[in-house]
Amino acid sequence: MWRIMMKSKLHRATVTAADLNYIGSITIDSDLMAAADILPNEKVQVVDNNNGARLETYAIPGPAGSGVICANGAAARLVQPGDIIIIIAYGIFDDREARTYQPRVIFLDARNKITAVKKGEQPGQVWV
């Protein structure tokens, strides 16, 4: 059996821009993509903590060290600058690997700088 599991996530990223006229995707600082093991054009889920919106799109790299998180295309209708979001990447694992895999969780501050890198999540853990 194959299982779709969280592979990694960028936790509490701050949206820096929204470009309705771009053809699609979410632009993410390439340093953050590398930290979260997200490849260019990889499918990601975006969860907006401000309004509850959820969407799927693909990641494109932004300038390294810039902190850019830009919702492009239709996503700009759901995610606005200043919103706090979670960007989640998933992987497909066989049953055995799924039971032991520990996802990489990248915690960010308000300027999208990495504050912590953790493996896995603990039930009841709160990070604000």
UniProtKB/Swiss-Prot annotation:
Active site: S25, Y58
Cofactor binding notes: Binds 1 pyruvoyl group covalently per subunit.
A molecular function (GO) term: aspartate 1-decarboxylase activity
Residues given in the record as substrate binding sites: T57, G73, A74, A75
Keywords: Autocatalytic cleavage, Cytoplasm, Decarboxylase, Lyase, Pantothenate biosynthesis, Pyruvate, Schiff base, Zymogen
CDD domains: Asp_decarbox
Pathway annotation from the record: Cofactor biosynthesis; (R)-pantothenate biosynthesis; beta-alanine from L-aspartate: step 1/1
Keyword check for Cytoplasm: yes
EC number of the protein: 4.1.1.11
A GO CC term attached to the entry: cytosol
Pyruvic acid (Ser) modification, residue list: S25
InterPro entries, per the entry: Asp_de-COase-like_dom_sf, Asp_decarbox
Changes after translation: Is synthesized initially as an inactive proenzyme, which is activated by self-cleavage at a specific serine bond to produce a beta-subunit with a hydroxyl group at its C-terminus and an alpha-subunit with a pyruvoyl group at its N-terminus.
BP terms from Gene Ontology: alanine biosynthetic process; pantothenate biosynthetic process
Transmembrane parts of this sequence: none
Reaction(s) catalysed by this chain's protein: L-aspartate + H(+) = beta-alanine + CO2
Subunit structure: Heterooctamer of four alpha and four beta subunits.
Protein family per UniProt: Belongs to the PanD family.
Record's function text: Catalyzes the pyruvoyl-dependent decarboxylation of aspartate to produce beta-alanine.
Protein name as it appears in the record: Aspartate 1-decarboxylase
Organism: Moorella thermoacetica (strain ATCC 39073 / JCM 9320)
